[in-house]
Amino acid sequence: MGLPWYRVHTVVLNDPGRLISVHIMHTALVAGWAGSMALYELAVFDPSDPVLDPMWRQGMFVIPFMTRLGITNSWGGWSITGGTVTDPGIWSYEGVAGSHIVFSGLCFLAAIWHWVYWDLEIFCDERTGKPSLDLPKIFGIHLFLSGVACFGFGAFHVTGLYGPGIWVSDPYGLTGKVQSVNPAWGVEGFDPFVPGGIASHHIAAGTLGILAGLFHLSVRPPQRLYKGLRMGNIETVLSSSIAAVFFAAFVVAGTMWYGSATTPIELFGPTRYQWDQGYFQQEIYRRVSAGLAENQSLSEAWSKIPEKLAFYDYIGNNPAKGGLFRAGSMDNGDGIAVGWLGHPIFRDKEGRELFVRRMPTFFETFPVVLIDGDGIVRADVPFRRAESKYSVEQVGVTVEFYGGELNGVSYSDPATVKKYARRAQLGEIFELDRATLKSDGVFRSSPRGWFTFGHASFALLFFFGHIWHGSRTLFRDVFAGIDPDLDSQVEFGAFQKLGDPTTRRQAV
């Protein structure tokens, strides 16, 4: 049977045993990739600085997902929070990776077994002796089992009743840790940033899935609905399964890109909207103002800003700054962050405090403009010095640092002032090591960006797949000349006109 490459899956169309086999093999590949990728990431991951070199700066992709579900320790003796551990237990990062690889191997063997022993009695219709699947019943079984898993995850794993809980943090990504979560049954449970909604929604969805599964196991579909939706055709299952997958992919692309309780910034990095809205900058200024209100000096107030919070307020951590096709981690772009230099405050010769206008997300270059508290331009770095009126030299701009490594240091020479004004466009100023990884200075995206791009792209592709296979199954008789009510097996290539027994080919 000579099939073109895009039609090879027809070999399992009327073969339930081998249909199971190829799905088990697919599971083996997925689990094997996950375990192998986890081991690779653990081999290259540096856990020494969770503040300035967290997992998302290093381009880790599967470690954040393990951490989000409650894994924090390694058999190497380190913890994701920066401490050391003596007894990580079996469910460490390596334990999870190993279990996926073992599971992959078992699935591989099961797939081979089902490929060899494909003609099982369980697949045969007692009345006809031909292979057939009771698809509505199988749907009910799968719905019931997935409902049990969903309910169990929400009621036991997330709540900590039997499990570790999940990663929970504050709105600014400073105090994250794994903890148990109580279900949120009120209106607050619909807030995407409330962790309690994860528990309550899994419990509710799981309960619904269990009830719906029992319904589909006990109630047969009406004949007209069965025929109208082609419920006896395996391609109907394919079409509706693809619909479920692309819908889920669109949802998680949104929760990842826009942020939610399921995608903490400590594990996946900040979102672009936090830069656009000055989210961390506002919190930093609020803390400094609160310190000044308590009679702290400007230097003391800025020195109490957590380095972690200052690091979030840096454009290099914005996932929208990296191009989609710039390979590598953020550390390979602008370098490994070594330390916060402090907050620069610029002043003109009249003593006015000046603020550098920050670079918007989608600019690669941006004019250096310094404005006062009223938004009036007071200084800039001109493109044409001959026509300048507000140059740093003319206005007499100076800069002084508060907090960080340069706390109390001031500069008045124009070249240095302009250097720090340019860097202040990018948010808080950090010392970056570009030598270690031979970083090229071009911003990269974080795993948040990669995940969103991948899932949005595949969701679109799978949407078209759903339309394609849904159309094929609904209009099979039109497209292929096969009667939709035809129950007999069709041997592809046996007839000149597919499904028409009067056009049987002659054996050569």
From Swiss-Prot:
Free-text comment on the cofactor: Binds multiple chlorophylls. PSII binds additional chlorophylls, carotenoids and specific lipids.
Protein localization: Plastid, Chloroplast thylakoid membrane
Domain of life: Eukaryota
Pfam families: PSII
A single GO molecular function term of this UniProt record: electron transporter, transferring electrons within the cyclic electron transport pathway of photosynthesis activity
Keyword Transmembrane helix: yes
GO BP of this protein: photosynthetic electron transport in photosystem II
Keyword Transcription: no
Keywords: Chlorophyll, Chloroplast, Chromophore, Membrane, Photosynthesis, Photosystem II, Plastid, Thylakoid, Transmembrane, Transmembrane helix
Predominant cellular place of this UniProt entry's protein: plastid
Membrane topology, record value: Multi-pass membrane protein
Membrane-spanning ranges: 21-36, 101-115, 140-156, 203-218, 237-252, 457-472
InterPro entries: PS_antenna-like, PS_II_antenna-like_sf, PSII_PsbB
Example of a GO cellular component annotation carried by this entry: photosystem II
Recorded family membership: Belongs to the PsbB/PsbC family. PsbB subfamily.
Protein task: One of the components of the core complex of photosystem II (PSII). It binds chlorophyll and helps catalyze the primary light-induced photochemical processes of PSII. PSII is a light-driven water:plastoquinone oxidoreductase, using light energy to abstract electrons from H(2)O, generating O(2) and a proton gradient subsequently used for ATP formation.
Subunit structure: PSII is composed of 1 copy each of membrane proteins PsbA, PsbB, PsbC, PsbD, PsbE, PsbF, PsbH, PsbI, PsbJ, PsbK, PsbL, PsbM, PsbT, PsbX, PsbY, PsbZ, Psb30/Ycf12, at least 3 peripheral proteins of the oxygen-evolving complex and a large number of cofactors. It forms dimeric complexes.
Protein name in UniProt: Photosystem II CP47 reaction center protein
Organism: Fagopyrum esculentum subsp. ancestrale (Wild buckwheat)
